[in-house]
Regions:
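Histidine-centered, transition-metal-coordinating active-site segments
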Residues: 1-80, 84-90, 97-99, 119, ...
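Short coil/turn segments at secondary-structure boundaries
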Residues: 67-78, 91-92, 107-114, 127-130
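Aspartate-rich (DDxxD/NDxxD/DxxxD) Mg2+/diphosphate-binding motifs
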Residues: 100-129, 135-136
Length: 382
């Protein structure tokens, strides 16, 4: 039996919860185009994101540790893949559209500049008087304008729901700005669970990378209630955590967070009588959530990571280096645009110098930014 697009949509209609986003009900694309024979609209979107230059570049962009620090630390790409996996698990358990959750997860960090959140803060400061910079908006700009792969239009021509999910991405570190995407309404539940999948992924893998790097000591974990309780349940001695024990611990922490979100979200859906996508959109607060207790524990964990990992002197030095590199590059490009590659110079004529420089720098990998700095400022650079 062949699973055509029509067959896939029919199976989706039967299998999904009444409040899920069905691909058959999408608001469609900005530019009309033929449907795929064997893919739903959201599956087609996922494949388009996967093949972008911006997605490939995530491999060499910082999560916490700069790419050259080691091959085994998470990058922005491995983080994205982990978010997509968690999002699919949450969507499957809640009867939601896995394909929509996956593509929003895959696209949510496309607009991140080099050097992680430090790079974003620097670009936001540099662009404050020139239209600003926000990585969610930059992700949307990439998929609607900067990627050029089709003769009839710029961008990827993704469905409305995927674009909405990108621009309304929201975590404790990301605040959405969705002027053109019904900002008064909540996004789909699929997009909401991506927000939590993002938090779940970085809570677990930043903790893992912090321990692996030695910047966090296993004994410090006892300061955090949820970690202390989990270690007791697993009968692990946090003062003597072996490499194998660490892997078990992180895996169980991931499972704990995912299970809690499924149970808490399902409970509020039932309690509030959510029976349609419209109910999801009009609900005053996000439906996807942790339980109250675990939510408080996750806030404590985030505070612990901020104080002990993100503000560790080793990471602070990386941040200072990133700030210096990006500020000097921005200054050089804007004061002497002739330094820019021809394509960027053309973009500057069309869209303005500062926006073109911002797009160029936001698209850089950590390695490219450092190499570019050396080419411009190292007297022996080539």
């Amino acid at each position: 039996m062949r699973y055509t697009r029509e067959r896939l949509l029919e199976l989706e209609d039967r299998a999904l919860a009444p409040y899920a986003m069905r691909a058959s009900e999408t608001r469609g694309r900005e530019h009309p185009e033929p449907e795929s024979a064997y893919r739903t609209p959201f599956q087609k979107d996922r494949d388009r994101v996967l093949h972008t230059t911006a997605f490939r570049r995530l491999e060499y962009k910082t999560q916490v540790f700069v790419n050259y620090e080691g091959d085994y630390y998470r990058t922005r790409l491995t983080h994205t893949l982990e978010v997509a996996q968690v999002a699919r698990s949450l969507a499957r358990a809640l009867g939601l559209n896995e394909d929509l959750a996956e593509v929003v997860a895959m696209a949510h960090d496309l607009g991140h500049p080099p050097f992680g959140h430090a790079g974003e803060r620097v670009l936001a400061e540099l662009m404050e008087a020139h239209g600003g910079f926000d990585h969610n908006k930059q992700s949307l700009r990439i998929v609607t304008w900067l990627e050029r792969r089709y003769p009839g239009f710029r961008g990827l021509n993704l469905t409305w729901e995927v674009r909405e999910g990108i621009v309304k991405h929201e975590t404790v570190y990301d605040l959405p700005s969705a002027e053109d995407y019904e900002p008064q309404l909540r996004p789909t539940l699929e997009a909401q669970i991506v927000n939590l999948a993002d938090e779940i992924a970085y809570n677990a893998h930043d903790l893992d990378d912090g321990l692996r790097s030695g910047l966090l000591r296993p004994g410090q974990l006892a300061q955090v209630e949820v970690l202390r309780e989990l270690a007791a349940e697993l009968e692990l001695d946090l003062e003597r955590l072996s490499e194998f024990d660490r892997r078990v611990f992180i895996r169980e922490l991931l499972g704990l967070m995912i299970t809690d979100v499924v149970a808490a979200t399902d409970a509020v859906i039932a309690a509030e009588g959510i029976g349609s996508l419209d109910d999801v959109r009009r609900f005053p607060v996000p439906l996807a959530r942790y339980s109250e207790r675990l939510g408080a524990q996750m806030a404590e964990l985030r505070g612990f990571l901020y104080a002990n990992l993100y503000r560790h002197y080793h990471i602070v030095r990386q941040v200072a280096k990133a700030k210096h590199v990006l500020e000097r590059l921005f200054e050089a490009y804007t004061q002497m645009p002739e330094m820019l590659p021809p394509g960027v110079q053309t973009a500057a004529e069309e869209e303005g110098l500062f926006r073109a420089v911002c797009d160029y720098m936001a698209g850089m990998t950590d390695r490219y930014a450092l190499d570019e700095y050396a080419r411009i400022f190292d007297p022996y650079g080539r």
